[in-house]
Amino acid sequence: MKQALFIDRDGVINIDRGHVFLKEDFEFTEGIFELCRKYIDDGYLIIVITNQAGIAKGYYTEDDFEKLTDWMVEQFSKKGITITKVYHCPHHPDIDGPCDCRKPEPGMILQAVKDFDLDIKECILIGDKETDLEAGRRAGIPETNLIFFNT
C-alpha cells in the first residue's frame, strides 16, 4: 500500500482569491514547491483535492478548470514534482443538492484510496479550511496527520 499527501488547491497551493480559473489570477503560495518536493522525497504521492463550486455557479466551465489544472500541473512538473492526480468537486449544495465529493464529505479522498491502493492511516492532508480537515477525518486520516495551512 502507498501513502499520499492530500493537498487542497485554493488557499494552500495558490493564494485564494475566490473562484480562480485563469492562470493570470493564479499565484502559488510561498514554499509550496519545496513542501511538495519534501513529501515526494519521503515517498508520498501528491494528490490535489479541491472544491470548485464556481463550476456549478456558472463562473467558469469544466473546460476552464481543466485548462488551469493542466497549466498548474505543468508548473509543478517543471520543478521536478509530479502531481499524481487532481480530484475536484464541481457541485454546490444550493444548486446541485448534496453530493459525496464536496468537502467536508470524504468522497474525493476515498476515491483516491481506491484508485491508488493507499493506506489511509499513512496519508497526510493539508488544508486551509475546517472542511478540508473534516473530510480527512471522515475518510479515516489520523488526527495527527491533518495539517492546517495558514497563509
Locations of the language-model features?
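Active-site neighborhood of HAD-like aspartate-dependent phosphohydrolases
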Residues: 1-47
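Asp-based, Mg2+/Mn2+-dependent phosphohydrolase catalytic module
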Residues: 3, 63, 67-84, 92-125, ...
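Short glycine- and Lys/Arg-enriched binding-loop motifs that mark or flank ligand-binding interfaces
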Residues: 7, 14, 54, 123, ...
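Active-site flanking residues adjacent to catalytic metal/cofactor-binding acidic residues
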Residues: 7-9, 50, 126-128
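Anionic group-transfer/hydrolysis microenvironments
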Residues: 10, 52-53, 105
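Metal-dependent phosphoesterase signature
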Residues: 13-30, 55-64, 79-81, 91-100
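A generic structural micro-environment signature
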Residues: 19, 26, 32-34, 61, ...
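Substrate-recognition element of Asp-dependent hydrolases with the DxDx(T/V) motif
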Residues: 32, 36-72, 82-92, 136
